[in-house]
Structures are given as C-alpha cells and as structure tokens.
Design a protein with these regions (language model features):
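Membrane-interface "cap" regions at the ends of multi-pass membrane proteins
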Residues: 1-45, 158-161, 186, 193
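Membrane-embedded alpha-helical core segments of multi-pass
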Residues: 1, 68-76, 116, 157-161, ...
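Short, Lys/Arg-enriched, Gly/Pro-containing loop segments at transmembrane-helix junctions
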Residues: 14-19, 85-89, 196-201
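Helix-loop-helix junctions that connect adjacent transmembrane helices in secondary transporters/permeases
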Residues: 52-160, 244, 248-300
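Loop-to-helix junctions at membrane interfaces in multi-pass transport proteins
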Residues: 23-25, 29, 46-63, 98, ...
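Short helix-coil transition sites and intra-membrane helix breaks within transmembrane domains
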Residues: 7-10, 37-41, 84-88, 120-127, ...
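Hydrophobic alpha-helical transmembrane segments
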Residues: 3-19, 57-62, 91-96, 121-124, ...
Length: 300
C-alpha cells in the first residue's frame, strides 16, 4: 500500500491529478475502488455477522444494497460525470453543488461540507475499527496497536498519492475481498463436508428451527413483517449520496469506461453480497460451539 502511494505520487502534476486522478480512471479501477470502499468491513464482517446471529432474513439488507448500487450506477453515475465537468469542472461534491445551482453566497458548499465532515467522522471511525479488528485477528496484534498501524499506513499513502493512490489500493482490496468471499465457503464445505452443515446448524443453539433460520421470509419463528423488509431494503437508499462513491463517477475517463464500470461493479456486488450471506450461514455451522454474548463471541 505504501509502495502504491509512492508510485502514484509521481503522477500528480496538478490539483486535478491529486483530487480526481486527472479524471483518467479506467473502468475496472473505478468499479472495484467504488465498491470496495463502499462495502469495506461491513461486507466482510457486518453482513455475515448479521446472518450468523439472526438468520437468512438478514439477506434483505443485501438485496437493498444491491438495488441501491444498481440505481446509483444507472441513474447517478453518468449524469454526475457529465455535469461536474459542465459545472466549472468541479472537483468535489460541495463544489459541484455550489456551481450547479449558482450559489454565489457559498451556502450550499458550506452546508454540504459540514454535513460530510460530521457524518464521515462516524463513518470513517467504523471503517478504521473494522480494519483494526481484522488486522488484529490476522496478526495477533493488540487491537489498539493494529488500529494505529492501519490508520498510519492509510494516512501516509493518501497524503502521498492522493485520490489515485486511494483508488488503486481500493482496487487491490476489492480483488482481495472477492477472492476471500469465494474461498471461504469452499474451504468451509471441504472441512465440514456437505452432510454435516445442517446437523451443525441444528446443534448451534438456534432460537428457531433450522428451516426457519434458513428462510428469508421468517423472523424469530414467524413470517417476517413488511416493515422489517422495508427497513432492511432502505439500507440501499444511502448509496446515491455517499461522497466517497460519487467522486469515483466524477473521475472516470469517459462514458465508455463508465459503462464498463457499471457492469463490473454490479456483478462484483451481486457475487460478493450473496457469498457474504452464505458465509454467515456456513460460519454458524462451522463455529457452532461459539455463541454470542454481551462481551463478544465465546465458546461453550
């Protein structure tokens, strides 16, 4: 990651290069960097954890995220790419809004910047936390040390290489995430054997029957309510307003590359979300002696 920061730093010749990669991102980098930064630790830890704890009904969240992703690429991406150039070649979302609506008093740019800063402090904190936990579990390092190391590495390559470094590292992470969600289910099935998955689920301390646990239309042993489905689907609404995703649309090279990005991103998200849910179920079968408590996961 640090090497990517050093290499991309040499390509930054102007502020447009530093903040938007010179609007020259290729289709694959645009797609995977957008989706990797979007899904991040949530897809690797949060979604499988929800399915592990509460059952397949949590897949409605994944469905909502998929719908939101598709709408974002189909409705927002192309228009934002075109209009940010027309609106004074804007390099940030606040600048685009200000230029697009001819805000001479900088009211829009101020409000949008404040909103982004406030909410992204929380969002970034959760991303750093999930990264720290993952790094700590892999290296056996103390969580706080892992958090600091991860944060320092991210800050260094971001300051060195700017937007291009961020997108390149996110592209690499997107490939690694895809390999991970493909490999884990295969390895679990090999280790457990197909005949042991359902018996392990039955013996894993479920609060409901295994068939209800595996049914997306059942929640707590009863048919899932429309409100629960709607609230989970609503997770996808946020995608059309996430600045760190939208800025990728602004930076793609041209409309042709954007069309390629759309296809790659949607396929990546579909595969990754489905497998993340599968990992949650298989994880319950594989780790069935482990139960959830207020202090975290423990073995009984």
């Amino acid at each position: 990651m640090l090497g990517i920061g050093i290499i991309t730093a040499r390509k930054n010749k102007s502020s447009d290069d530093y903040f938007l990669g010179g609007r020259n991102l290729g289709g694959w980098v645009t797609a995977l960097s957008a989706q990797a930064s979007d899904m991040s630790g949530w897809m690797l830890m949060g979604l499988p954890g929800c399915v592990y704890a509460f059952g397949a009904n949590q897949a409605w969240i994944a469905i909502g995220l998929l719908i939101g992703t598709i709408l974002n690429w189909v409705i927002v991406a192309g228009r934002l790419r075109r209009y940010t150039i027309r609106a004074g070649n804007a390099m940030t979302i606040p600048e685009y809004l200000s230029n697009r609506f001819r805000d001479k008093h900088n009211i829009l740019i101020t409000i949008s910047a404040i909103v982004i800063v406030i909410f992204f402090v929380v969002y970034s904190a959760s991303a750093f936390a999930s990264g720290g936990k993952l790094f700590a579990s892999i290296t056996k390092m103390d969580y706080h040390q892992a958090l600091i190391v991860g944060a320092v590495v991210i800050l260094i390559y971001t300051f060195l290489g700017g937007f291009l470094a961020v997108c390149t590292t996110d592209f690499v992470q997107g490939m690694m995430m895809l390999v991970g969600v493909l490999a884990v289910p295969i390895l679990v099935v090999i280790v457990l054997g197909t005949g042991n998955i359902v018996p392990n689920l039955v013996n894993s301390g479920l609060n409901v029957d295994a068939k209800d646990y595996l049914n997306i239309f059942m929640q707590d042993g009863k048919p899932i309510s429309g409100i629960s489905i709607a609230s989970q689907l609503a997770w996808g609404l946020g995608y059309c307003g996430m600045p760190h995703i939208l800025v990728r649309f602004m930076a793609v090279r041209d409309e042709k590359e954007l069309a390629k990005s759309k296809k790659v991103a949607i396929v990546w998200v579909l595969i990754s979300l489905v497998l993340a849910c599968v990992i949650g179920v298989l994880g319950r079968a594989y780790l069935y002696p482990m139960v959830l408590s207020n202090e975290g996961a423990q073995y009984e």
